[in-house]
Amino acid sequence: MKLTCVLIITVLFLTASQLITADYSRDQRQYRAVRLGDEMRNFKGARDCGGQGEGCYTQPCCPGLRCRGGGTGGGACQL
């Protein structure tokens, strides 16, 4: 009787964990290498322009941003 209860609880627990995992991974890509490639493509160091709040002393600002607050250390890209 105790063994049956333990088995039923174990099956319910494993089923619940499978359902939770399925919901979590639904919107993620299947292959990790593809995700890593996308992350490397969008890496901050791979861009040729500075994003909002980044310094614009050594690189130009991205389209739609302007270099503001010029001082000794250079400005920052802002809207």
UniProtKB/Swiss-Prot annotation:
Its main location: secreted. This is Conotoxin Vi6.3. Disulfide bonds join C49-C62, C56-C67, C61-C77. Ion channel inhibitor that inhibits the increase in intracellular calcium upon depolarization in DRG neurons. In vivo, both intraperitoneal and intracranial injections into mice induce hyperactivity. The modification 4-hydroxyproline is found at P60, P63. Belongs to the conotoxin O1 superfamily. The keyword Transferase does not apply. Residues 23-47 form a propeptide. Expressed by the venom duct. The lineage of its organism: Eukaryota, Metazoa, Spiralia, Lophotrochozoa, Mollusca. It is found in: Secreted. Keywords: Disulfide bond, Hydroxylation, Ion channel impairing toxin, Knottin, Secreted, Signal, Toxin. Residues 1-22 form the signal peptide. The presence of a 'disulfide through disulfide knot' structurally defines this protein as a knottin. The cysteine framework is VI/VII (C-C-CC-C-C). One of its GO terms (cellular component) is extracellular region. It comes from the Eukaryota. InterPro entries: Conotoxin. GO terms for molecular function: ion channel inhibitor activity; toxin activity.
